[in-house]
Amino acid sequence: MPHSIDMEDSSAIAERSKHAGLALEPEACFNLPQPTAEDRQDNWQTQYHSSEGAQGGSRKAQAADATTGNPTVDDASQQNGLLQQWVKQGYFMPAEHGSKAGNDVKHKYSPPKSDVWGVLVACTVITTWAALFYHSIFQIKLPSIEQLRSGNYNPSDFTSWPHVLLAFFSLEFLYTGLFITTHDAMHGTIAMRHRKLNDFLGSFAISLYAWFDYKMLHKKHWEHHNHTGKVGADPDFHRGNPSILPWFARFMMEYSSLWQFAKIAWWATGMQLLGAPFQNILMFMTAAPILSAFRLFYYGTYIPHHPEPGPASDKVEMDWTMSRTSTAPSLLSFLTCYHFDLHWEHHRWPYAPWWQLPVCRKLAGRTNPLHTEALQTAEPSRLEHGG
C-alpha cells in the first residue's frame, strides 16, 4: 500500500492545478465525497485503494489475464504508487478520476514502470521528422509557381512527383506525431517521473510543429478534459454549430495567436535565408502542418465528440464517457492518427501514452454497460465504444 499523501503534497498539487487553469483547493484533490452528475471529483486514494479489493486479489487477476491473453495486470499497490507519482507531478484530471465510467476495468491498466520508452518514442518521432523536414525543404527540387503556371520547365530537372508526394504525406504524418508527442507531454506520459524533461520535449515538439505556446495548450487541454463536450466550457467543442468546417475553423482560432504567426514568419524567413526555396516552404512548412491539423481535429475531436444529427444537436453535450472509439486494427489506428481515434480509452486512462492505447482498448473490451448503451446511439460506422 503506498504511503498517504500529506497536505503539503496536495497543496503543491493544487498550486500546479491553479497554474494549469484549475482553481482546486488541496481538499479538492483527494477529499471530496462520492461523485454526483455535476461534481465527480472524488477521493483519489479511496478510489484506487478500493480498486485493489475489486480485483478479488491482484495475483488472481494477473493469472486470469495470463490465461486470457490480456496484457499483464500489476497489483493495485504498484499501480497506486505509479499513479501517485503522476498526481504529485500535477497531472490530476478530476472529472475523469471521479467518474464511475469504466470502474470495472480502470484498475487493470498501469503506466509504464520506466520513462525510457516514453522518451525514446518521443525522440524517435522528433528526429525522424527533423531528417525528413531537412530533405523536403532543402533537397527536394520543385518547379516554381510561375513555371507550373506556364508549363515551361523540364520535369527531369526536378524531383519526381511520386517522390514529392511520398515526402509530403510522410512529413504530414510526422507533423501529426509532433503534436501527439506534445499531447502526451501535457499528460505527463513521456517522462512521468521527470517533469522538466517531459515538458521540455513537449514544448520542443510543438515549437517544431507550428510554434504553439505549450503552457497555453496545457491549460486549454486540462479544460477540455474537465469539461468535455460542454458548449462554452470545453475549448475543443463547437460553439453552437457542430458542422465540421465551422467547428474546425473555430477550433483553429481557439489555439492560434498573432504572436504564433509572427514566430512562424520568422521561422520561414530563416529557412529562406538558409537557402530553402519558397515553393518548398509553401508545401512542406505550410500545407503539410495544416493538413496535419485537420487530421488531428477530425480523428481526435470531431469523430469522438460530435453529437448525433438532430433538431437540437447544437445543444447536445458530449460527456467524455460518450466518446467514440475506433474498432480499426492497431496498425490502421496508428496510421490514422497515432491511436488518437481510441478516444474513450484516452479519457478513461489519461496517464496512458499513445503507444499503449491499443492495450487499453483490449482491457476495456465491452465490459462497461456505458459502452453498449452509448453504442446504440453511435453512428453506424467502424467507430464505436469499447471496440
Swiss-Prot record:
The keyword Coiled coil does not apply. Residues 43-53, 65-78 have a biased composition (Polar residues). GO terms for biological process: carotenoid biosynthetic process. Transmembrane segments: none annotated. InterPro entries: FA_desaturase_dom, Fatty_acid_desaturase. Pfam families: FA_desaturase. Pathway: Carotenoid biosynthesis. It is an enzyme of class 1 (oxidoreductase). One of its GO terms (molecular function) is oxidoreductase activity, acting on paired donors, with oxidation of a pair of donors resulting in the reduction of molecular oxygen to two molecules of water. The keyword Oxidoreductase applies. Keywords: Carotenoid biosynthesis, Oxidoreductase. It comes from the Eukaryota. Involved in the biosynthesis of ketocarotenoids which are powerful anti-oxidative molecules. Catalyzes the conversion of beta-carotene to canthaxanthin via echinenone. Residues 1-78 are annotated as: Disordered. This is Beta-carotene 4-ketolase. Its EC number is 1.14.99.63. The gene is BKT. It catalyses: echinenone + 2 AH2 + 2 O2 = canthaxanthin + 2 A + 3 H2O; all-trans-beta-carotene + 2 AH2 + 2 O2 = echinenone + 2 A + 3 H2O.
